[in-house]
């Protein structure tokens, strides 16, 4: 097969830039106005979630002239949920964005935009970022990194052929991902049905200080010579799914980590809107951005605590209680002041059994998803080596 040339993204892009948070310039978000797009406005596959859109004034939009969006602009998340890719459409405009989304504007006639979007979501690009990670807890990508990305660029006819085939498989992957999302939504709906919205105590349950009901502690389990080290990039946003397990020798564990056991719930205080809450299935160590919580066995079920923390109501509330513009973290003083509803343990355990059944269904869907992803990756390998 004829070798396909590789180019840097900067060689084909008219513009690579990013936006700014309006509040840093003295502007506030408002009920309506110009659309302001953030990472949470897009699903994993880049689908636009209109109801998540924030809004800014026309004056603010003009002030943020550098990041005014156009139809066809590619948005690439460079902070938090790294590597989420979306293409700006007419329905999103007028619009602006913040510093967590890189804007990639490609206008050349010899380039097929759907092909570029596919390449940016592929292992070809992910592998380049993985090499830059170098053990940090939370990878952030700079505009320089985006400019330096190398991608294969065949003739336009080949781009169209490749994108057409891969989009079909990508459609299967998206369908499986939506199945998983529906199962997650089912669990959330069941939670609300049984317990009501967290923090509102609609059912009139007894409440308890969250740190009394689930003490925070770095508790060392029975660790082997090779230890599971959990960093935030291994946790899927919104679902808390552990994407992969990184193992290290126990002697390599540094001071900026916390120990946890399989009885804990791990809550990420960094960028709480990403909703990274994990129920670990074995002992290990984690980045200190994770808070290990240990629910009292006779009062609080682990699954109940986990989904209480994952609930939309809690995520919305806690996302406003952060400090730090570039690396927003939950205020731990505020977190410790929270009270959690304490339904009867029997009801919590009924919910946990429901979660367990849904998890079994998710395993089957995930298997089909993994097979489709494997096919996608093998075809990418066939096309580009």
Labelled PLM ranges:
Residues 125-128, 317:
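Periplasmic-binding protein-like
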Residues 52-55, 167:
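Short glycine-enriched, charge-decorated loop/helix-capping segments at active-site entrances
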Residues 2, 21, 78, 94-102, ...:
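A short glycine-rich beta-alpha junction/loop motif
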Residues 63-64, 136, 248, 254-255, ...:
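A structural connector/turn signal
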């Amino acid at each position: 097969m004829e070798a396909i040339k590789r180019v840097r993204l900067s060689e084909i892009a008219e513009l690579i830039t990013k936006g700014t948070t309006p509040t840093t310039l003295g502007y506030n978000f408002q009920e309506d106005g110009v659309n302001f797009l953030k990472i949470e406005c897009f699903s994993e596959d880049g689908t636009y979630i209109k109801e998540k859109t924030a809004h800014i004034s026309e004056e603010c939009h003009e002030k943020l002239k550098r990041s005014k969006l156009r139809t066809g602009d590619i948005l690439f998340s460079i902070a938090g949920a790294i590597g989420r890719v979306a293409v700006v459409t007419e329905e999103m405009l007028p619009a602006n964005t913040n510093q967590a989304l890189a804007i990639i504007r490609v206008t050349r006639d010899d380039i097929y935009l759907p092909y570029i979007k596919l390449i940016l979501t592929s292992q070809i690009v992910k592998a380049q970022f993985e090499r830059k990670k170098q053990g940090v807890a939370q990878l952030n990508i700079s505009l320089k990194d985006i400019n330096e990305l190398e991608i294969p660029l065949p003739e336009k006819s080949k781009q169209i052929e490749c994108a057409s085939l891969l989009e079909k498989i990508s459609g299967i992957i998206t369908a499986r991902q939506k199945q998983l999302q529906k199962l997650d939504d089912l669990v959330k709906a069941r939670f609300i049905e049984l317990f009501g919205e967290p923090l509102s105590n609609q059912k009139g349950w007894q409440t308890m200080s969250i740190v009394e009901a689930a003490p925070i502690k770095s508790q060392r389990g029975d660790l082997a010579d090779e230890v599971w080290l959990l960093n935030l990039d291994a946790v899927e946003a919104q679902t808390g799914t552990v994407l992969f397990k990184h193992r290290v020798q126990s002697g390599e564990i540094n001071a900026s980590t916390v120990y946890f056991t399989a009885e804990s719930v791990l809550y990420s205080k960094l960028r709480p809107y990403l909703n990274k809450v994990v129920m670990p299935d074995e002992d290990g160590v984690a980045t200190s951005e994770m808070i290990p919580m240990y629910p009292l066995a006779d009062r609080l079920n682990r699954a109940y605590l986990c989904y209480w923390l994952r609930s939309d109501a809690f995520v919305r509330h806690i996302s406003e209680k952060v400090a730090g513009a570039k690396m927003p973290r939950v205020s731990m003083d505020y977190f410790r002041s929270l009270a959690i509803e304490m339904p009867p343990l029997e009801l919590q355990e009924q919910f946990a059994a429901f979660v367990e059944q849904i998890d079994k269904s998710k395993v089957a869907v995930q298997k089909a998803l993994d097979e489709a992803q494997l096919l996608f990756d093998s075809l990418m390998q066939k096309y580009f080596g």
